[in-house]
Regions:
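Nucleotide-sugar donor-binding/catalytic module of glycosyltransferases
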Residues: 1-197
């Protein structure tokens, strides 16, 4: 890994709402990333189960963490709040009931850098009480033009509409926000905005 001071800042936006049973593992996995130059933005969206207090506790332990407490407004509004304060050249999103592999952002950063890309993507696991399985992993690296990426995204093949399995260049979100009070907000942002702007 390169010197942290020479690496671009990655802002990771994490909406948090009543996920105390999962939140500690989530935050540990983010704080433990091999890519160290992180700004970790936790948006406590009016939690009532102690999740907000746990966010504050982690912020006391790790100076890279910023916590914003707001009245419950939904995931889109929480992500928008994070976008408004994010300082990084690169953006990532993590759902607060998920955890990520220790080298996820190092891996995604090197994919961006080595391929001159605007967005990089990785596979993911689905973990249940019974089993864990890998989703959308061919074991191969692929590079897409903007047109190919949009077509693949719309056809729902190797690229999915999730925000949390990708790393984005910040400029893709200039003037872009998640639609509030709308289901499948990931699709609106992925197809309509960021992928159309990517090169």
């Amino acid at each position: 890994m390169e010197n942290t001071e020479t690496l671009p800042l990655i802002s990771i936006i994490v909406p948090v709402y009543n996920v105390k049973n999962y939140l500690e593992k989530c935050l540990q996995s983010i704080c433990g990333q091999t890519y160290k130059n992180l700004e970790i933005i936790l948006i406590d969206d009016g939690s009532s189960d102690g999740s907000g207090e746990l966010c504050d506790l982690f912020a006391q332990r790790d100076g890279r963490i910023k916590v914003i407490h707001q009245t419950n407004a939904g995931q889109s509004a929480a992500r928008n709040r994070g976008l408004a304060v994010a300082q990084g050249e690169l953006l990532g999103f993590v759902d607060s009931d998920d955890w990520i592999e220790p080298d996820m952002y190092e891996f995604l950063y090197h994919l961006l850098k080595e391929n001159g890309a605007d967005i990089s993507i990785c596979s993911h696991y689905i973990e249940t009480a019974v089993k864990t399985r890998v989703k959308h992993s061919s074991g191969q690296f692929s590079s897409f033009s903007r047109e190919e990426a949009i077509r693949t995204l719309v056809e729902d093949k190797r690229i999915r509409n999730y925000m949390w399995d990708k790393l984005y260049k910040r400029q893709l979100f200039a003037g872009i926000y998640f639609p509030v009070n709308r289901v499948f907000e990931d699709i609106a942002v992925s197809v309509s905005y960021t992928h159309l702007r990517a090169h």
